[in-house]
């Protein structure tokens, strides 16, 4: 039996990316269990540290701009990488 719950929280497009041969684009679960299992067992809303939108998709909507914009992201920590990823979409 294979458990895929956490990887699907980390990247809901996991299967599509794998089927398309784009494994390098999969947002990988780091196995921290902090926002998924700890929150679940603590009676809190489940989420994911590598995908903060997990279980919050209807609340955290990204609205595309009318036209493309050039931006600069300063920093390569988790917040900077997440901001760059969202901006690229």
Question: Where do the model's predicted regions map?
Answer:
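Flavin-dependent oxidoreductase catalytic cores
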Residues: 1-74, 78-89
